[in-house]
């Protein structure tokens, strides 16, 4: 990232030793390492975020182009025209309500049932015998 070679690093170490002294140099090196690590992480996060945003913008642009080729604008115009026509008919219906039909025509008629069906009588053998007896 910074393209620092060994000679440059050695020069920085010697200057740091002269300026800070042998007691504070390890502490300063540790703190410097922590800060460099934090900076690298931040740069990496920012770089990945920028990449994600660029990819998202590419996708939006591609979708926009695909939408143009599919004629979405034409479809949207057709839908809007249909909605306007439906609104016109709705206004006509609200201005001129239909006259109500007579109550007899508006209510559905149920089929009339004739007389209630009577149960069928079953003939038992004893009834047959009594009828034959009556005939004689």
From Swiss-Prot:
Entry GO CC: TAT protein transport complex
Extent of the signal sequence: none
Matching Gene3D superfamilies: 1.20.5.3310
Entry keywords, A to Z: Cell inner membrane, Cell membrane, Membrane, Protein transport, Translocation, Transmembrane, Transmembrane helix, Transport
Gene Ontology BP term (one): protein transport by the Tat complex
Composition skew (Polar residues), residue ranges: 99-115
InterPro entries per UniProt: TatA/B/E, TatB
Keyword Nucleotide-binding annotated: no
Disordered: annotated span: 89-136
Subcellular location as annotated: Cell inner membrane
Function, as annotated: Part of the twin-arginine translocation (Tat) system that transports large folded proteins containing a characteristic twin-arginine motif in their signal peptide across membranes. Together with TatC, TatB is part of a receptor directly interacting with Tat signal peptides. TatB may form an oligomeric binding site that transiently accommodates folded Tat precursor proteins before their translocation.
Name recorded for this polypeptide: Sec-independent protein translocase protein TatB
Naturally occurring in which organism (per UniProt): Hahella chejuensis (strain KCTC 2396)
